[in-house]
């Protein structure tokens, strides 16, 4: 006999583990008992509900039922047990029952649906519109829209909705209830309603019985403290039931209304069949009778589950579910080969002779191997921004450079429409390539600094017109760094200069009023002028032994005075012959044109108001207009100061001007007339209108 058993066992196939479909389910639901039971992914509140109901009932059965059975009726414990049984069975059935999950479309079904909603030759049509994602069906003569679910790749049936917590489309979706730990839908709504009703009855029953117990004790003890000492757990049960009974009864009443009208919580909140969202529409799903609606919802046939949870997963099904759970992009192989580190900061890859720097990922394609790029948020001036670090350089056979942008400033976050210069620098999106030739600094400190492009505008007086020349130096050697338009500064100095510019802009906005303070132009450049800077050459990072001010100090001082402008890292130079309306220009390249127009308008307005308001006897008006020069024009500034002193001594400006005859309108915001004698003859920028008698 034993030999026969051994032979039979040897002929049997080896035991292989069978994969069920619930193990590969695409949603977030939890499954128990080999797929027989399912619930929501988060069931912590459900366990709290069970503890509250079970604990309160246990206290009632242990301390109240014996006294009430002897004093009133022995059937009280039986009624309480029946209500507790109905409540817990309805709760468990609601939690572990499939609410009506609609299975997702397979790959072939999704492709077929996409083909149906696709518009032929849509990309070539000038009136192209995205394909519609809704369908219309008739339900009892009323049009109902079917919405397309992008997650499940299906057109949802009427009254269905997608639960974001469970990540499934549920038929006749009512709501997601964390107290029961599951969605409430078509297949478990009846159990949910029975749970609410039975819980309401149980709470009312326990509360009334506990209060009765306390009242009977009061008749014997005649003191509240003695009653509390005699039945402390009864007092706890009364408090729990008192604070929970109102919400339970209200929720049960609300769902009774929904059941009698054949509506869902989702439809009631949206006002689909009420006058909340407009004219009242008739509910096409109602049977027209309260009893029929209740019988259909609570006593109607229960539809089978649409998901085959315990079915055996075939190889085709496994491949399909793996494809749905982890879709791959067309460039996923390229991205994985580059081992890139993605950041949330915008980046720009340079375009060189044979390479293209990818935006955001640091991929260089065309002649060079794939290379990662990084952004060092902790140290913007670190060596990863310079030279051979490869942090911002996405290069092929040529030189291609990119810029990493730091996180947006607080001013940008708080005021998105702010016009401050700090926001423009932070909000600047690199649209073009800027070639920064490699330059090896001699010290380690200089190697950790990057070149900041400081665009200076040279103003040339040509018959009253102002022409601007923006120069961008592409230094390729140490000798070419003598260009006055290229300043090598450190990152902290740039940040300080930008902050000073922002403060200066805010101060100008506050000073725009009709006060006399707007008539003066306190020019701060005189403090920065040195006789050793006559050739307007700025060299090095710090002050040299000869006493030359550092480029960072000059930049910061000019920023504080409000004379520094166009401090952008990649703003293209704008010439006079460039059309300002050209759409290919940089987004900030029209700032110079606006400033030019504003300054010309100010000059015209100032001279006009002065000539109209001065009450002089046949004066010969003359205007001495000295334009602002650069920092290095020391000789011109001295000449201008001497001319002003000579003009003051010869023409008696103080007695010739009748300040009382000036109209108040000349004190406007745009007036820049200097009508008071300047105390500093060496001012670098003076705009004065005089009348020679």
UniProtKB/Swiss-Prot annotation:
Q: Which keywords accompany this UniProt record? A: Acyltransferase, Cell membrane, Endoplasmic reticulum, Lipoprotein, Membrane, Palmitate, Transferase, Transmembrane, Transmembrane helix
Reported EC number(s) for this entry are 2.3.1.225
One Pfam family, short name please? Answer: DHHC
Catalytic activity as recorded in UniProt: L-cysteinyl-[protein] + hexadecanoyl-CoA = S-hexadecanoyl-L-cysteinyl-[protein] + CoA
Loss of this gene results in the following: Semi-lethal in homozygotes and heterozygotes with adult escapers showing abdominal planar cell polarity defects and also extensive wing planar cell polarity defects, both proximally and in a distal region between the third and fourth longitudinal veins. Greatly reduced accumulation of dachs at the apical cell cortex.
Compositional bias, Gly residues, is annotated for 387-401
UniProt keyword annotation of Lipoprotein present = yes
List cellular component terms (GO).
apical cortex; apical plasma membrane; endoplasmic reticulum; endoplasmic reticulum membrane; Golgi apparatus
The entry's note on the tissues where this protein occurs is: Detected in embryo, imaginal disks and pupal wings (at protein level). Enriched in the somatic musculature and gut throughout embryonic development.
Q: Domain comment text?
A: The DHHC domain is required for palmitoyltransferase activity.
Reported function: Palmitoylates Dlish which is required for the apical cell cortex localization, total cellular level and full activity of dachs.
Q: What is this protein called?
A: Palmitoyltransferase app
Native organism: Drosophila melanogaster
